[in-house]
Amino acid sequence: MQRIALSDKLELSRIVYGMWRIGDDADTSPAHVQAKIEACLAQGITTMDQADIYGGYTAEAILGGGLKAAPGLRDKIEIVTKCGIVAPAGRHSSARVKHYDTTAGHINVSVEASLRDMGTDHVDLLLIHRPDPLIDAEETGKALDALVASGKVKAVGVSNFRPWDFSLLQSAMSNRLVTNQIEMSLLATDTFTNGDLAYLQEKRVSPMAWSPLGGGSLFSGAYGGTMAALQRIGKEQGVDATAVAIAWLLRHPAKIVPVLGTNNLERIRTAADALRVTMDRQTWFELYTLAIGKEVA
C-alpha cells in the first residue's frame, strides 16, 4: 500500500478505513474489532478514521476495546478523530439542541475523552468536524496549537470546511492545517468545480474524501449507467467496481485520500485494489460524464 505524507510529522496509508459505522456491526466485541483492524493491515490500510460523535459517542470506545485486547496494535496504526459537533446523546445527553462548539474548553475536553475512550496517549490527526458559525478563530487556533505542543495531537486539520473557513482558521495558527476531509465521490462531484479542490491544491494540502462510494448508494441499482461502466473497466483490469470508483478519486492530482465507510470486509479488500488500476484521462472523464449526467461543455 502506498503512503502519503500530510506533513513532515504525519504519513497516512493511501486509503483510510472509516469507523463511523463500526457500532452498527452485530458484533462489536474487542476480538471482532481487532480482526477488522488486522484485515485492514493485511491490505496495507494503517489509518483509522474516527470522530467523537460517531455511534452516539460510542465508536471511539469500541475501537479502544479492540486496541486494549491487542497490545502493540496501536503502534501499527494512525488514528484520525474529530470534534466540534455536540448532539443530545451519550456524554452530551443534556444538550438541548444539536450544535457546534469550537471553543478551547470544548476542544480540550473532547480530546481528553477521545484519548480515554480509545486508550491511547495521543491521536495522530485531529480535525474540527464542521465549520462553526460562532467560531473565534484566534481561540480555536491557539487551542489546536497547544494540543500539538503538548504531544496529545501530532497534526491538525478540518472537515467540511469551505476555502474561506479554512483560510480564516489557518490565519490564526502557527501549525499548518494538513487536510480538509470533504465529501467526494461519483455521486458528489461539486468539489471538482466549486473551488474546494483548486484551493487545496494551491495550498498544497491533500484532502481526505468521506463517503467515496456515496455511502453505498452507488451500488443501490439507481445508477445503472455508472455501475455498468465501473464494472466494464474493472473487468478489463481484473478488479472489482469498488476499486475503480476509488481509483477515480486517486487519479485526481490533488492527491485525494479516500476514507472507506463500510463494515463489509470484502469491500475493504477489493477497495485496496484501486492502487492497481490504471486510469487515463478519457476513462476519468467517461465516469465524470456519467456522474454529472451530461457531456462537459
Curated annotation (Swiss-Prot):
Thylakoid as UniProt keyword: no
GO MF, one example: oxidoreductase activity
Lineage top rank: taxon: Bacteria
Induction of the gene: Induced during growth on sulfoquinovose.
Enzyme class: oxidoreductase
Residues binding D-glucose, per UniProt: Y54, K98, H129, R130
SUPFAM superfamilies: NAD(P)-linked oxidoreductase (SSF51430)
InterPro entries in the record: AKR, AKR_Detox_Biosynth, Aldo/ket_reductase_CS, NADP_OxRdtase_dom, NADP_OxRdtase_dom_sf
GO cellular component, one term: cytosol
Quaternary assembly: Homotrimer.
Function: Part of the sulfoquinovose monooxygenase (sulfo-SMO) pathway, a D-sulfoquinovose degradation pathway that enables the complete utilization of all carbons within sulfoquinovose (SQ) with concomitant production of inorganic sulfite. Catalyzes the NADP-dependent reduction of 6-dehydro-D-glucose to D-glucose. Cannot use NADH.
Protein name: 6-dehydroglucose reductase
Species annotation: Agrobacterium fabrum (strain C58 / ATCC 33970) (Agrobacterium tumefaciens (strain C58))
Lineage of producing organism: Bacteria, Pseudomonadati, Pseudomonadota, Alphaproteobacteria, Hyphomicrobiales
